[in-house]
Amino acid sequence: MARTAKTLTFVIPAYNMESYLDRCVSSLLSATNTDDIEVLVVDDGSQDGTLEMAQKFEARYPGIVRAIHQENKGHGGAVNTGIAAANGMYVKVVDADDWVDPESLEQVMTVLREEADSTEPIDMLVTNYVYDKVGKRNKHVVNFRHAMKAGERLTWNDLGHFGLAEYILMHALTYRTAVVRESGMQLPEHTFYVDFIYAYQPFPWVKTMKYLDTPFYHYFIGRDGQSVQTDVMIRRVDQLRLVNRCMVRATPECDTVPDGLYRYMIHFLAIESSVASVFMILSRDPENYEKKKDMWDDIKAYSPTIYKDVRKKAMSRALNLRGSIGRFVIRKGYFVAEHVVGFN
């Protein structure tokens, strides 16, 4: 496969991120050799100094950093723009308030350069990520040691068992750029939680992957108004439903893809469906209880097989307990998980 000049493109969707962008971009430029790294800062119609800061980085690092300005399209629209503009053989999305670990960056670049020079480069690299929550001393590191053997070329059928709360999020993913484009993924604009789609729709086009057991990505939690705060997610349950609908329609039938891929996609779809259900229940709003029912009815109408397989999952069964008892179980279960994991 022909070697491109850029090994890795980082896409940074940025809206009003003037206070955080310097930390993010600086971490991406901490590599010993940045010649084959590309950093695209997609300013999504910011109202602060985000664009000006991105342009300063572009002037300071010509040929490496590029500032892209667009009218506001939301997180998904900014990711779409970045992927379309990417020149790297591989692409990774880094939110502007997050950052990467410098030592892990060196390891990642070593692996990707080797793959870029090979005749059959992997389609996806999976790395660990850290929930970096404000005020929490012990940071929760998400790894995939139980499901993936580190350092080896893997296919979907080589993967082990993913536990109830184990899944591959955007923070863990580096895709081969061509794979994302071939998948035809276009994230919904002006919609939150499209990260679920990003870590799902391209997977049927991924044939080979590697797992690097290093804490590459730091996921910052604690910024006011952040989309993963409980009250915010409750207000945005309609967007969680939209994301669920997109994921359902990106799910292949079981006889069209490797067994390992189908099992994982059902596992992750069950988790997203469960997350959406949790926040509909946490709202204590009867209208949202009805929306929860409508969401599950939509899955069943689209594919009875996918619906049956998703409902088999333990978390999904628990979330579909009827009446006030079921709602009580979910409310209590969420807050226990929140305390242990530091998700929110």
Q: How would you label these PLM feature ranges?
A:
Residues V91:
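Short aromatic/hydrophobic "clamp" motif used to bind/position activated sugar donors
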Residues M17-S30:
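Short, well-formed alpha-helical segments that are part of the catalytic scaffolds
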Residues Q70-A86:
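Glycine-rich, basic loop-to-helix element that forms the pyrophosphate-binding segment
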Residues L282-N344:
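Membrane-interface aromatic/basic loop that binds lipid-linked glycans or pyrophosphate carriers
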Residues T191, T208-V243, S283-E290:
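Nucleotide-sugar-dependent glycosyltransferase catalytic core
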Residues H75, W99-M209, I221, G225-M233:
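Donor-binding/catalytic cores of nucleotide-activated saccharide
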Residues S27, D43-E52, G74:
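A conserved acidic beta->alpha catalytic loop
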Residues D36-G45, R66-E71, A96:
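Short beta-strand/loop segment that forms part of the nucleotide-sugar
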